Amino acid sequence: MSRYPVYVEITDDLCLGHCLDLPGCTVRASSRAETLARLPAAIREHLAWLRRHGEPVAPEADPIEVEVAGESHGFGPFNPGDSAALFPPDRAPVTLEEMEVYFRLMGHARADLLALVEGLPDEMLDRQQNAESWTIRRILRHVGNAEEWYVSRLAPPETLPAEWEHDDELPVFEFLAMERRTAVDRLRRLTAEEREAAVYPARWTNHPDEPWTARKALRRAVEHEREHTGQIREILLCDKT
């Protein structure tokens, strides 16, 4: 049996569960109980995902259990612009070697995303299911812009990549590639102090009281892309029915 600590963010009608030992492994549901019930299967799927991408993973154990190690109430990253919790493990300094592991996970998530959307005609990229829904193209722009934003939580504005100033002029797939390349390059140049500090950036946010660390930003980068890859997968499935 394997037991994993999990962390949850809870509002009145939504809950997001995270397995921080497996960055990118999350479950979003309408209640705490449903989230916790679904997390063991999500962990098993995430381990299978890591194996598919060639990551070293221990042999599968049965059963998988979860233990709530921390909870945050009243807010969570359920919609663009929402604040996200800083859990105790997020406060640990990130080593350069650990950063490369996160970058590898980001690469796996990007490979999954591109496998879904590369080759789609413009008609499908721009199809809107209803008045409130986002097109796939808009989701892709959001994914790239989010990487800018995560980096901007950690690095001084004057040190951010100049390529970001006119990124909206790039075709969407060139945009995604540029954002990833420049974001990773800038993150690799974080100082030791920046990789261990907890900061409260007030720029480009409605939540200046939200704490950030390098580990939280890297975790959210992996989680965020995997969440939106799932969203696009659902859109494409709906288009087939």
Question: Where are the regions that the model predicts?
Answer:
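Short, charged, surface-exposed hinge/linker loops at domain edges
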Residues: 1-3, 44-99
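Short, flexible segments with low predicted structural confidence
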Residues: 6-8, 77-78, 84-85, 111, ...
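Acidic/histidine-rich alpha-helical segments that form the ligand environment
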Residues: 88-119, 167-200, 216-221
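A broadly tuned preference for mixed-charge, low-complexity surface segments
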Residues: 68-77, 180, 184-197, 237-241
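Generic secondary-structure boundary/loop-capping signal
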Residues: 63-65, 122, 197
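Generic signal for short, ordered secondary-structure residues
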Residues: 14-15, 81, 85, 92, ...
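Short alpha-helix boundary/capping motifs
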Residues: 63-67, 141, 167-168, 177
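Short, contiguous alpha-helical
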Residues: 5-18, 22-29, 36-55, 114, ...
